[in-house]
Amino acid sequence: MAPDSDPFPEGPLLKLLPLDARDRGTQRCRLGPAALHALGARLGSAVKISLPDGGSCLCTAWPRRDGADGFVQLDPLCASPGAAVGASRSRRSLSLNRLLLVPCPPLRRVAVWPVLRERAGAPGARNTAAVLEAAQELLRNRPISLGHVVVAPPGAPGLVAALHIVGGTPSPDPAGLVTPRTRVSLGGEPPSEAQPQPEVPLGGLSEAADSLRELLRLPLRYPRALTALGLAVPRGVLLAGPPGVGKTQLVRAVAREAGAELLAVSAPALQGSRPGETEENVRRVFQRARELASRGPSLLFLDEMDALCPQRGSRAPESRVVAQVLTLLDGASGDREVVVVGATNRPDALDPALRRPGRFDREVVIGTPTLKQRKEILQVITSKMPISSHVDLGLLAEMTVGYVGADLTALCREAAMHALLHSEKNQDNPVIDEIDFLEAFKNIQPSSFRSVIGLMDIKPVDWEEIGGLEDVKLKLKQSIEWPLKFPWEFVRMGLTQPKGVLLYGPPGCAKTTLVRALATSCHCSFVSVSGADLFSPFVGDSEKVLSQIFRQARASTPAILFLDEIDSILGARSASKTGCDVQERVLSVLLNELDGVGLKTIERRGSKSSQQEFQEVFNRSVMIIAATNRPDVLDTALLRPGRLDKIIYIPPPDHKGRLSILKVCTKTMPIGPDVSLENLAAETCFFSGADLRNLCTEAALLALQENGLDATTVKQEHFLKSLKTVKPSLSCKDLALYENLFKKEGFSNVEGI
């Protein structure tokens, strides 16, 4: 049986599509004309849908806006507890025989059990009249069924989050319609099933959700079975990850699935001003979790744990708070139905005593989303937005390297705001187009980039904009671009991804421009580091900054870390006489980082169950590219294979390369018909790429000088006059030095000479 087919394929299959944003909260079932005719349904008829994953939902039949057959869209506003419509990954289609037209007579009275927002407890905890009014408003003109749950639409105001239908008359019918004459009452017994919360889509968090679900659902649902088996289950879980990746959202979703009462507390909010107040607040929160556990499984979520439990030092108040939390965590292990979940973006700042078994037994790391995960997140966010069919979410995912879930939400919100402002002038119904997302990119930067040292917002450069150097371009693509884009082929051939590349050659030969083009083609982060970013008057600060740069680059992978003019940052250790030179210490840190660059176990994201997910894991590394025009002063340990695997010589352009560079430089320049780029290329021997661009600039300025500001063309005579003033920056002696530099050293990884 195909994994996406219905288990009862006796009827026509309808493909289950995501709900249109305009139909949220309407309780509609969108069907094609053929399906409506087969059911004999009229507009607004009540339809009961039996779901493949169990449960059912009650909707009203409505035609699809595009009139297409073979598709179905559901709004499960009224469904049985635990029913899963859009969350199923194993089934993507429904048999038409699962849709049943049911009678829906008006109801005289209905009894409901309300689920209040903010976990207010029993209905009597708040004004009964206000709760009853909110329940009547939620049920008005809706078909309902006994035992089903009516969930408030997303974003709807009011006290009530959901209503359990616990009674109604007449009861023999499978469904009934709540009319203005229907008497709604609060009564009955609360259902034994977990009180539902609005479904939280987990775009890009599936693997972390599986890990957390495994740790939480077993002790919460099967505590006695685990005790009988003699298994000690973890009572505490620590979530670690950068801000905005969805730690809180993940906990809420898993708590909903496990049917647990969630008590979410921000740790900084527990801080008190007077002595002992913080400890008192912490004890009160744990006591509240125990009270909730008396009614069923309870989950205590402590956000920003590093603010509450930093590493203990000489400050007595912090030590007392940490000791109190440790005592309460040890006591919570005796409460079988209380699970404590902590979240932090600084796990190293926590006191080590918290992270031992028996307290926070397990740690679940949520990293910056990968390409596949960003696409899933964008699909979840835009499913509620009217986006144009021209918007390519895959392309947006490629453009959002380093964006976390909160950044992507802000990006979509900014695009929606731009579309709204644009629609006031052109149309009544705003539609988010590709241009709106491009405008939003100007205002929304990824949060993981905001504190990165040396991060550059580079101007995109295409390979075609770099004249000549075809052999060098191919070598760079093979060394860096191919491993990022075709990792499966590399593994099949037994190849490993290079860790680093050294570009060396005369000044002005496009070393930096080549790296910019490489970063553009690979769609990766680009971090450029110079000596000014590293060196500090304080001892040990430079080494710390370099380690921080590598750590931040790994958090923004795939990334290219560009060490421009590396000779000014590092030197050869043999040239240091004191043995404690700062460049020598920085070199030591760089060598250690190069040996350790790659995918750490705690940073792993995605799985290897498919080729695309394997590519996500393979790309979790930082590519080091260094550039210098003085390779003779570099330490030989840096140049061995395994660190800077490839040493590529960037030669000055030959005749063909100079002609290509001149064409690129004069592409936007109004040159006259008498200009012969072929002759200019022949006359510019020993000119670097920077020299040729300077030559074209001087010729254009000379044309303005001779013909005034009204000059329209640059003629051949202007180029010839500029040749008399612009001299080449290279010589035969310089070229011979670069070409023979590594030959005598015997390096096997030098290319391009």
UniProtKB/Swiss-Prot annotation:
Subcellular locations according to the entry: Cytoplasm; Cytoplasm, Cytoskeleton, Spindle; Nucleus
GO cellular component: cytoplasm; cytosol; nucleus; spindle; VCP-NPL4-UFD1 AAA ATPase complex
Chain spans, region Disordered: 171-203
CDD domains, sorted: RecA-like_CDC48_r2-like (cd19511)
E.C. no: 3.6.4.10
Coiled-coil region(s): none
Effect of A41P: In NEDHLS; reduces interaction with AFG2A and CINP; reduces cell viability
SMART domains for the chain: AAA
Coarse class of the protein's main subcellular location: cytoplasm
N-acetylmethionine, modified sites: M1
Region feature (Required for interaction with AFG2A and CINP): 1-189
Function: ATP-dependent chaperone part of the 55LCC heterohexameric ATPase complex which is chromatin-associated and promotes replisome proteostasis to maintain replication fork progression and genome stability. Required for replication fork progression, sister chromatid cohesion, and chromosome stability. The ATPase activity is specifically enhanced by replication fork DNA and is coupled to cysteine protease-dependent cleavage of replisome substrates in response to replication fork damage.
Summary of subunit composition and partner proteins: Part of the 55LCC heterohexameric ATPase complex composed at least of AIRIM, AFG2A, AFG2B and CINP. Associates with pre-60S ribosomal particles.
Protein name in the entry: ATPase family gene 2 protein homolog B
Lineage: Eukaryota, Metazoa, Chordata, Craniata, Vertebrata
